[in-house]
A protein has these predicted regions:
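Short beta-strand segments within Ig-like beta-sandwich modules, predominantly Fibronectin type-III
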Residues: 70-76
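Histidine-/acidic-rich catalytic cores in large beta-rich domains
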Residues: 4-14, 18-56, 60, 78-80, ...
Length: 557
């Protein structure tokens, strides 16, 4: 059958939740559902009832105190205990404890899990000073292919999603995660929007955007979402130069920031600049105190800050070479020793002290081709800048990575996180080598025998207290606790926003002749039709620039 229909998220989740019953189950005979939403294999749901209201405490036993998790559940007679952080391919030990009628009740439960997928990557190196670490996990998202995975301080996998979830993976104020959908809207990597999920992988909301989602988002103080998006129908044919504010409750776009109205598209040209991807925004950060938005333009080697209310440009961090005269006043003048500009940066953020924290990928280290530094002599850094907007000066106050030379060099992606004063994560997520030599390009563009790596370092008071090396590229990493105060809700899934409408050519085509070789054509071009809840997806393999017409009848179902 050419046409396949995809089951809706609501239908699938409602079907699974029919099994979530507590009636007839007690602490001595609880119901245990492994991976209840078929999306997060290292989780389980334990269900039972008690005669009186009790507050169960659950302990998932680890190898040591840094890998053992405890969570207290709310007072109730009906119990839906979320079990997270199970080890793969192991009989896990879980202890449930509560007090009822002045009696302490304890119950030990064992849950056996399956093996990890063969293509899920395990660490090749782990260093952990456990005296300075908690039991929080390190949540990684894939560069392109792969899994969203959380590792503990021993490097063991304690959580992962089977559904593809790309780009950022940050916890919202309500305790849920916000991840990119698996649904492609436009090549090469733009997806339809965002899913709000819990640790089971249950989807509570889907936010769809006409311009899709890429790279980053930010949860504003009022709960709305600032999302890196596109306008696929703009007259300039550009991408990655739009940021939208999405109403959290309705999914409607209530404000649009178009960077074509802020910057000159021909300024600040770097090696990676193209006419359509001139800015390449890869991070979004909102600062309440200044009511401003900080964005990272990789292809301009520039971090910019704009006014939220007016969209006017406030300042630019970066080398001002190749920028027109009218923009020079927005650049900072460097002061102090050992200062270096950032190049092809990612993950720009504003710290509580109003410093600017950036992952400096370090590509070329110049805008002038004759001065380009080759990959084998390049290095990437997490760098902290202190800016003075009164006299427009900038000082480099901290960095990590230069001392690691090209072994820590990521030509693309990567991340930094501010955890607390003098406490940071620097994630070099795009280390690529071709024939053992550092590459300036992602894996698909690197020649020779390609090897991939990500190297993530946690630093406290200038001392490395944790490091994890993985044999793959990872987009970002977030250090987060396994549990929050948010418990499972059986509320229905909400679909918010819109993908817009596809332009239709109303030209009359005429009579369509049946083709006896239709099956061969479908096979030759790998043609597929997928009927989703909000769109019909046509896919196939054709020669570049070939025109393909998709003709639908009015009575098509």
């Amino acid at each position: 059958v050419l046409l396949n229909k995809k089951e809706s998220i609501m239908t699938l989740q409602k079907s699974l939740e029919k099994e979530f019953v507590t009636k007839g189950y007690t602490i001595d005979n609880p119901k245990i559902i492994k991976d209840p939403y078929k999306a997060s294999p290292l989780t389980a749901l334990i269900l039972f009832k008690t005669k009186t209201k009790v507050s169960p405490k659950v302990t998932i036993k680890g190898k040591d105190i840094n890998t053992t998790f405890t969570h207290n559940f709310k007072n109730s007679k009906e119990h839906y205990l979320e079990i997270y952080g199970l080890y793969p391919d192991k009989e896990n030990e879980i202890e449930i404890e509560y007090k009822e009628n002045d009696q302490v009740v304890k119950k030990a439960i064992k849950i056996k899990t399956d093996k990890l997928p063969s293509d899920l990557h395990l660490p090749t190196k782990i260093f952990a000073d456990k005296t300075k670490l908690s039991n929080e996990l390190y949540f990684f998202t894939p560069a392109v292919k792969g899994y969203s995975v959380a590792y503990d301080v021993n490097g063991d996998v304690r959580w992962y999603l089977t559904n593809k979830a790309v780009w950022d993976n940050t916890r919202l104020k309500n305790g849920h995660l916000l991840v990119g959908t698996e649904r492609l809207i436009y090549k090469p990597y733009y997806v339809t929007g965002l899913y709000e999920i819990d640790m089971f992988g249950k989807v509570y909301k889907e936010y769809s955007l006409p311009g899709g989602y890429h790279h980053d988002y930010f949860e504003m103080p009022n709960g709305n979402l600032l999302v890196a998006s596109n306008d696929f129908h703009n007259s300039s044919g550009t991408v990655e130069d739009i940021v939208v504010e999405v109403d959290r409750n309705t999914g409607k776009i209530i404000k649009t920031f178009d960077l074509k109205n802020v910057l000159n598209m021909k300024d600040g040209v770097s090696e990676n600049s193209t006419s359509y991807d001139w800015f390449h925004n890869n991070s979004v950060w909102y600062d309440r105190d200044t009511n401003s938005i900080t964005l990272s333009g990789r292809h301009m080697d520039a971090v910019i800050n704009i006014d939220y209310k007016t969209s006017k440009l406030n300042w630019i961090i970066g080398d001002s070479t190749n920028w027109s005269k009218e923009y020079q006043k927005y650049f900072f003048k460097s002061i102090g020793e050992n200062f270096e500009w950032q190049w092809r940066q990612h993950a720009a953020m504003i710290t509580p002290k109003k410093d600017v924290f950036i992952f400096d990928n370090g590509n070329n280290k110049s805008k002038i081709k004759e001065k380009y530094v080759p990959a084998e002599k390049s290095y990437s850094r997490g760098v902290l800048y202190k800016i003075n907007k009164e006299d427009m000066t900038i000082r480099q106050v901290w960095q990590y990575g230069k001392e690691r030379s090209s072994s820590f060099y990521s030509s693309y992606i990567s991340d930094v996180d501010y955890l607390d004063k003098n406490h940071y994560i620097v994630h070099s997520g795009g280390i690529v080598k071709g024939d053992l030599k550092s590459s300036n390009y992602p894996a698909g563009l690197t020649k020779g025998k390609v090897s991939l790596m990500s190297d993530t370092v946690e630093i406290l008071n200038n001392e490395v207290i944790f490091e994890i090396v993985l044999p793959t590229n990872n987009y970002r990493v977030e250090k987060m606790p396994l549990y929050t105060d948010t418990n499972l809700s059986l509320n229905n899934f909400k679909k918010l926003g819109t993908l817009g409408k596809t332009k239709v050519n109303k030209e009359k085509i005429g009579i369509l002749n049946s083709n006896k070789n239709l099956d061969n054509i479908i096979k030759k071009y790998d043609i597929k039709l997928l009927n989703e809840e909000d769109r019909l997806v046509f896919s196939g393999r054709f020669k570049k620039n070939n025109k393909v017409n998709v003709i639908l009848y009015k009575n098509f179902v």
